[in-house]
């Protein structure tokens, strides 16, 4: 009886294993896709990409990666088609990367596409050479690298508001009204997330390109405002574009969009520069006050330099002082009024008669009537 039960269990396990093998074997191959890429047949590539369940980051039966072969073809249309379907720009076949091939070939259009999707010009190939070191002597490539060095992948993102997100078959679908471009994979400008962890400074991470920043990226620089005629608008204060759409901009994650919608018309006036800002004055300096998890004591972290200190930084040490004026007889009476107003830095000892630029005192929260 026990032998019979064991035999049945073994047969069942073998059946499950066989099903697993069939399932694995049934996974769509990229052989047809790579063949279409090698022949530079765009319509065949589009047809191969339409196969349900296809993973464009899977090598074919001869270990060739679709995006590497597309870069080798020097056809920007093929590279763009793969990136639109979720191909990873940072991929490597163990020998080279798409960016190495495009840099060597002087293909500026492809290089821009790859950098925009997270390719790293400092990544190395099998020989240890970085992609930037193999670049052909082409001015356009030098300009692209200069932009990347200054701002990273976000230098090549679409302008905020360029994409519209819709739901189709339970999936997010993106299209760009300006040129009719459409894609299922999230565009780089729509892949930003705000990351908040207790005891750590807020940071922003692009889930597609991997770029991180402690400052609000242009893609997320949206505010909910009320126009002069009373209509509600989404305003991108970084790029100075507005959207009258009822739905939140495609760049905003749902949680952040809901938070902004709850606090419409919130902004601050900088009395020094005479400009309005939409970011909390608490972030006017790179210093953030955090709490040490072990001791519970406060400490300060500089998001730009990475420095930490237990002492209050001078940039945060400005206090406003208002002296009371005394009466004509030199005594302060019950009817005394506010006297001279100045600012004192408790760390550096400096004194200023006007609110120091960069301190929280220079900002005044604006009312809705100021809009």
UniProtKB/Swiss-Prot annotation:
Residues 159-187, 283-313 form the WW domain. Keywords: ANK repeat, Endoplasmic reticulum, Glycoprotein, Repeat, Signal. ANK repeats lie at residues 62-91, 94-123. It is found in: Endoplasmic reticulum lumen. Residues 1-24 form the signal peptide. The keyword Signal applies. The keyword DNA-binding does not apply. One of its GO terms (cellular component) is endoplasmic reticulum lumen. Coiled coil: none annotated. CDD domains: WW. InterPro entries: Ankyrin_rpt, Ankyrin_rpt-contain_sf, WW_dom, WW_dom_sf. One of its GO terms (biological process) is cell development. Glycans are attached at residue 41. May have a role in the remodeling of the endoplasmic reticulum upon zygote formation. PANTHER family: ANKYRIN REPEAT DOMAIN-CONTAINING PROTEIN 39-RELATED, BRCA1-ASSOCIATED RING DOMAIN PROTEIN 1. This is Zygote-specific protein 3. The gene is ZYS3.
């Amino acid at each position: 009886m026990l032998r019979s039960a064991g035999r049945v269990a073994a047969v069942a396990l073998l059946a499950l294993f066989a099903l697993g093998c069939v399932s694995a074997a049934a996974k769509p191959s990229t052989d047809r896709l790579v063949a279409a890429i090698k022949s530079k047949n765009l319509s065949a590539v589009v047809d191969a990409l339409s196969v349900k369940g296809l993973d464009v980051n899977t090598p074919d039966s001869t270990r060739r990666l679709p995006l590497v072969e597309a870069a080798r073809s020097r056809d920007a249309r093929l590279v763009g088609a793969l990136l639109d379907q979720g191909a990873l720009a940072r991929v490597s076949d163990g020998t080279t990367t798409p960016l190495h091939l495009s840099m060597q070939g002087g293909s500026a259009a492809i290089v821009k596409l790859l950098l925009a999707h997270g390719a790293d010009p400092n990544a190395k190939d099998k020989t240890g050479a970085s992609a930037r070191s193999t670049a052909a002597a082409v001015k356009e490539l030098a300009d692209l690298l200069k932009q990347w060095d200054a701002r990273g992948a976000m230098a090549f993102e679409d302008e905020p508001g360029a994409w519209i997100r819709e739901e189709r078959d339970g999936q997010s679908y993106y299209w760009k009204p300006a040129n009719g471009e459409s894609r299922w994979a999230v565009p780089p400008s729509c892949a930003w997330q705000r990351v908040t962890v207790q005891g750590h400074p807020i940071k922003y991470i692009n889930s597609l390109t991997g770029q991180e920043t402690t400052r609000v990226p242009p893609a997320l620089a949206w505010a909910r405002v009320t126009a002069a005629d009373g209509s509600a608008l989404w305003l991108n204060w970084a790029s100075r574009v507005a959207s009258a759409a009822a739905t939140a901009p495609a760049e905003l994650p749902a949680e952040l969009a809901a938070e902004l919608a709850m606090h419409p018309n919130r902004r601050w006036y900088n009395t020094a520069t005479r400009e309005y800002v939409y970011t909390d004055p608490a972030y006017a300096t790179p210093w953030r006050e955090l709490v040490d998890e072990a001791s519970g004591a406060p400490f300060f972290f500089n998001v730009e330099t990475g420095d930490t200190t237990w002492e209050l930084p001078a940039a945060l040490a400005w206090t406003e002082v208002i002296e009371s004026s005394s009466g004509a007889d030199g005594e302060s009476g019950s009817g005394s009024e506010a006297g001279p107003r100045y600012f004192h830095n408790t760390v550096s000892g400096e004194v200023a008669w006007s609110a120091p630029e960069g301190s929280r005192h220079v900002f005044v929260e604006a009312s809705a009537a100021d809009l």
